[in-house]
Amino acid sequence: MSTFDNAIADRPIGLTAPSGIDRAAHHRLDEAWLAAAWSHPTTRVFVVSGGQVLIDDTAEGGTEIVMTPAFEAPITETHRYFLGTDEDGVSYFALQKDSLPGRMDQPARPAGLREAGLLLGPRDAGLMAHAVALENWQRLHRFCSRCGERTVIAAAGHIRRCPACGAEHYPRTDPAVIMLVTDEKDRALLGRQVHWPEGRFSTLAGFVEPGESIEQSVAREVFEEAGVTVGEVEYVASQPWPFPSSLMLGFMARATSSEINVDGEEIEEARWFSREDLTAAFESGEILPPYGISIAARLIELWYGKPLPKPGSIG
């Protein structure tokens, strides 16, 4: 298999492009520095709630997260997360709250990461992904896995510490492989999960299991879901996927067999597509492409040779 010259880095989407933010982890335990940063007039803060933030589609530079000066934002009974600093020295924080604030003085609307990740620039998309991932982790890991006692937030949102036994718990990231498989005829293997809308096809994917390399995981997942064996595996790119805590590792893989036998549990249907087959299926509305924010769309585009149609623009 040849190396792809038009790598994802050449056409990054919001969650794969460099954000320009230095996460500055060395400041997370420095309470004096955090307090000074919070009171600095350039520091900006936004609210995250239920995986959503407020965005402004009318901003001069394009869609942006609605942020306010940190010193104007009350922090009582909220979780405050330090997200990092930019090249100009501006610090960014997120506040986790039960609901998003009302904004009557400017255009704003709530949006989740699947939508906002396509609209926001790299800086704001990266900040939102960081904040949403921390919010999900905080929500799901409130108790100590060692002794069962309630934990408290530390390190500006990046540690949960157990006062009872002293254990420290860190945000988890679950590695998952996602791969576009091609055969000797250069056809692409796409599948449809049981719970997806009718006609939605995408790449195969699955979690890496304990004691397994990512290459082994690619081969296992493809065989389990579609009954196809693979040989050569080529890493392409990664993407954070905080729904709630995955890191998607993107691959191209070459099949060594072509007979499909779906598992019927995760994958309901799988098919080989030539580029001509896929174009015809898109144009007829038979097939719906994966959502644009997903690295799946970029993997398919690397093989397809051009952008996929946007969902809702076909059929």
PLM feature spans:
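Nudix hydrolase/Nudix homology domain
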Residues: M1-H141, V152, W196-F201, D263-G315
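Short Pro/Gly-enriched beta-strand edge/turn motifs at strand-loop
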Residues: G62-M67, R160-A164, V233
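Conserved hydrophobic/aromatic beta-strand scaffold that supports enzyme active sites
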Residues: F82, F143, I178-L180, L190, ...
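Cys/His-rich short segments
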Residues: H130-L180
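N-terminal strand-loop-strand
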Residues: R160-S202, F207, T229-V230, A253
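Acidic pyrophosphate-coordinating catalytic loop
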Residues: A167-Y170, Q239-S246
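The catalytic Nudix box helix
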Residues: S202-A237, F251, S257-E259
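Non-heme Fe(II)/2-oxoglutarate
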Residues: L247-A270
